[in-house]
Design a protein with these regions (language model features):
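Short amphipathic
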Residues: 9-17
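Amphipathic alpha-helical interaction surfaces in cytosolic regulatory modules
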Residues: 17-43, 49-59, 63-110
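Short glycine-/polar-rich loops that comprise or flank the Walker A/P-loop
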Residues: 8-10, 94-95
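Short, Lys/Arg-enriched N-terminal segments with co-localized hydrophobic residues
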Residues: 1-8
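Extended, charge-rich low-complexity interaction segments
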Residues: 122-132
Length: 132
């Protein structure tokens, strides 16, 4: 854990801790690899880590280690879904995460993540798990 001013940082590396090939929106979109979708990322990885954060903790999410690219459906469902399904407001989510990368090409994906979160409407949809 890294200590920054006022916050303890917990790390999550998408390429190492989730998948080097994340894709798709819903588990039902990918019957052969439902564990690599945005829905799986949000429900099985991101949401539990966010819920486990203390008041003085943030989640540092590394997006470029071992991952070549991201589709918009994965990013939207994986990140903005936290807001859309009412788990956190966009302000709460943005205050709890920091998107990190070392490859400057991934600045584009960071901007897309922040854009999707900003556009998400809080609790605009009820989450119903998709079937594979």
């Amino acid at each position: 854990m890294i200590q920054t001013i006022g916050y303890k940082m917990k790390k999550f590396n998408i390429g190492k801790d989730f998948s080097t090939d994340p894709f798709g929106r819903f588990r039902s979109d990918s019957p052969k690899s439902p564990e690599r979708t945005g829905e799986a990322f949000r429900e099985d990885y991101l949401k539990p880590r966010l819920e486990g954060l203390g008041l003085d903790e943030k989640l540092e999410i590394f997006i470029d280690d071992g991952v070549e690219s991201y589709g918009s459906s994965f990013l939207s469902e994986g990140f903005a879904g936290i807001v859309k399904y009412g788990y956190m407001t966009k302000e709460e989510l943005l205050s709890k995460i920091e998107i990190k990368f070392s490859n400057e090409d991934f600045e584009f994906f960071k901007k897309k993540i922040l854009e999707y979160i900003a556009q998400a409407k809080y609790k605009s949809k009820k989450y119903e798990p998709t079937n594979t």
